[in-house]
UniProtKB/Swiss-Prot annotation:
This is Conotoxin Cl14.2b. The lineage of its organism: Eukaryota, Metazoa, Spiralia, Lophotrochozoa, Mollusca. One of its GO terms (molecular function) is toxin activity. It comes from the Eukaryota. Expressed by the venom duct. It is found in: Secreted.
């Protein structure tokens, strides 16, 4: 097995451990501290700062970023 294949296999095995979304979903992002948690909040709640509708909200019931 050459080095490239070994590297790709190692990358595939370690990807779930380094996935920020999975870490944030399981323990609130505490593993990487406040920076990771803030990045998650930007991803999750950016629509509220922009005063847009949340993805789960029907547009007819949306008002200033909240349902």
């Amino acid at each position: 097995m050459n080095v490239t294949v070994m590297f790709l296999v190692l990358l595939l095995l370690t990807m779930p451990l380094t996935d920020g979304f999975n870490i944030r979903a399981t323990n609130g992002g505490e593993l990487f501290g406040p920076v990771q948690r803030d990045a998650g909040n930007v991803l999750d709640h950016g629509f509220q700062r922009r005063r847009e509708c949340p993805p789960r909200c029907p547009t007819s019931h949306c008002n200033a970023g909240t349902c």
